[in-house]
């Protein structure tokens, strides 16, 4: 055995590393989205506790602008709905990546364990 991996195994290892990087990126995105959903939930909860006549402000870029409570609540609900959809998409992508990772691991085990690999 020359110590060098066959091209097929090298390719499978590269694919496995790529899938692992994709999984890490998705996990990071998922974490950020979960934080944003939680913040939206907290804001909606606080808005639910205050009277209708209380002055409410919302952030738009670097500005804080006075707004109607109902408008702010609707905007937050829409934002949360969008975030929830994005989160569900990320979760589905994570599931697909996990399946692909498992599939590649099995292929790699088969390739490394095959008797023909050591003949080169």
What are these regions (language model features)?
Residues 1-16:
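Short, charged, low-complexity amphipathic alpha-helix
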Residues 7-10, 70-74:
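Generic alpha-helical secondary structure signal
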Residues 46-71:
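Short coil/loop "hinge" linkers that interrupt or connect long alpha-helical coiled-coils or helical hairpins
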């Amino acid at each position: 055995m020359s110590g060098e991996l066959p091209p097929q195994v090298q390719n499978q290892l590269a694919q496995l590393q790529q899938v692992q990087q994709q999984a890490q990126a998705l996990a990071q995105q998922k974490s950020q989205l979960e934080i944003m959903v939680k913040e939206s939930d907290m804001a909606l909860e606080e808005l639910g506790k205050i009277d209708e006549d209380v002055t409410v402000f919302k952030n738009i870029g670097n500005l804080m602008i006075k707004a109607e409570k109902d408008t702010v609540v609707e905007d937050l609900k829409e934002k949360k709905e969008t975030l929830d959809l994005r989160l569900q998409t990320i979760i589905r992508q994570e599931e697909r990546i996990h399946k692909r990772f498992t599939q590649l691991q099995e292929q790699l085990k088969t390739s490394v364990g095959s008797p023909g690999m050591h003949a080169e």
